[in-house]
Amino acid sequence: MSDEEHHFEPAADAGASKTYPQQAGTIRKNGYIVIKSRPCKVVEVSTSKTGKHGHAKCHFVAIDIFNGKKLEDIVPSSHNCDVPHVNRTDYQLIDISEDGFVSLLTDNGSTKDDLKLPTDDSLLTQIKDGFADGKDLVVSVMSAMGEEQICALKDIGPK
């Protein structure tokens, strides 16, 4: 045994899991599920009866919460599925940079400058037009599995 002390650099994040397990049979419509490593919102669930050999199966149809793609998965109802931790936070829009990044005001008064404008055309147009008109805009940012994206907009009146 050595008398040397070992110093370990802590990792940047707290090591919190991006997902948690939930039994497939308990996941409902409008819930969340991870399919093909993507966080999704469940739009349809159907369950098949137990066969001669095996389990009842759950058929999930879900929409990726960030890119809107439809994904499907079939899982035995007694098995666990990964469910993403999904958070939605509102920030006040301060500025839009020329390279497509937004500057947002957080609750504690600091700014968040690492988010790009959304890819959804109608939302993008609403944000740009509202900002150009000098309106006070609040954007909702959805975050899950290490990804973040602006998903909604609220107009709280003129500045």
UniProtKB/Swiss-Prot annotation:
Under the heading PANTHER family, the entry gives:
TRANSLATION INITIATION FACTOR 5A FAMILY MEMBER (PTHR11673)
CDD domains for this protein: S1_eIF5A (cd04468)
- Answer whether the UniProt record assigns the keyword Protein biosynthesis to this protein: yes
Pfam family of the protein (one): IF5A-like_N
Residues modified as Hypusine:
52
* Assigned protein family: Belongs to the eIF-5A family.
Report the Gene3D superfamilies cross-referenced here. Answer: 2.30.30.30, Nucleic acid-binding proteins
Q: Where is the composition biased (Basic and acidic residues)?
A: 1-10
Which residue intervals make up region (Disordered)?
A: 1-21
Q: Which SMART domains match?
A: eIF-5a
One MF annotation (Gene Ontology) recorded for this entry: translation elongation factor activity
Q: Tell me a GO biological process for this protein.
A: positive regulation of translational elongation
Q: Does the keyword Protein biosynthesis apply?
A: yes
According to its UniProt entry, what is the function of this protein?
Answer: Translation factor that promotes translation elongation and termination, particularly upon ribosome stalling at specific amino acid sequence contexts. Binds between the exit (E) and peptidyl (P) site of the ribosome and promotes rescue of stalled ribosome: specifically required for efficient translation of polyproline-containing peptides as well as other motifs that stall the ribosome. Acts as a ribosome quality control (RQC) cofactor by joining the RQC complex to facilitate peptidyl transfer during CAT tailing step.
Keywords linked to the UniProt accession:
Hypusine, Initiation factor, Protein biosynthesis
Query: What does the entry's PTM section describe?
Result: Lys-52 undergoes hypusination, a unique post-translational modification that consists in the addition of a butylamino group from spermidine to lysine side chain, leading to the formation of the unusual amino acid hypusine. eIF-5As are the only known proteins to undergo this modification, which is essential for their function.
Name recorded for this polypeptide: Eukaryotic translation initiation factor 5A-2
